[in-house]
Amino acid sequence: MWKRTFGVGHIAVGLESEHRQCARDLEAITSLFADSDKEPTLTFSIRQADDISLSLNGEELWRGSDPGEITAAFEVHLYVSIVHKLVPELASIHAACVGINNQACVFAGVSDAGKSSICTKTLLEGCDYLSDEFSLLTDTGEIEPFPRPLQWGKEEHPAFTHQMMQNAGMKQASFKFPDRNGNIVTALLWLPKRVQHKPLPLRWVIFPRYDASVKAPELTTIRRGEALMELPQHLHQQQRADLMLQMLNQRIPKEATFHRILFNDVHEAWKLLKHSLFA
């Protein structure tokens, strides 16, 4: 039986698997999280008999014969369950986050806005990794790490080569699972070398937007009020708009600055950000 316990925010998550392939997959998916000696709040168990079952705290979540299918189900339930337990102590923002000079920079936006691409570029340039999807805002204005692996939906990425990722010290992992049509899909995971395991004070909030028609990146600074009106839509746990706005205003430090960047080339976007904000 393979076992491990890791921490996220103020909770611990326990994993155990009787299935060897599932254990390898779970180890890769959770490898960037720091070990914890706390009693787990959430315990995911994979059991093997005639088929394979996945359970959370004793309640069955999924059952099947394909280990990749079990791994895919685990990954979905893992992130949803963690966020559910962390809120409201932590506010989970749909945003990537990196550490720059021991301060947190958040890239918030909808899917395909380019936040993961900019996050990846910053990591290639030596920044510290906190998250590519879940930025956990504390009541003291810090971002807690949620370092799940970077994940490519395809074998290749339009902006980054495998060699670029490897040159930055990133390790590679993957798992395979059947899609809804029964076709085998490979999830390619990248494991950054520089991972931040302690919370960092939030300093920059950036709203990226990818636009293929833009000739050169455009960076603008926006008012705090404008940014706060936009941020609630990016919270994973929705509630009344006025309550979300009040919570964000109380938690985000007064010295934080807010920006938009419009870009079609992530490498040029990073050059502009570095020169304008991080020099």
Describe each model-derived feature in a short phrase.
Residues A113-K115:
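Conserved glycine(s) of the Walker
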Residues E69-T71, H77, I93-H94, R223:
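Short, flexible segments with low predicted structural confidence
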Residues I118-C119:
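Post-Walker A alpha-helix
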Residues K3-A28, E39, A96-G109, L124-L130, ...:
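Glycine-rich, often acidic-flanked micro-motifs
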Residues K85-I100:
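Pre-Walker A adenine-sensing motif
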Residues M1-F74, S81-I82, L86, W270-A279:
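Long, basic/Gly/Ser/Thr-rich N-terminal segments
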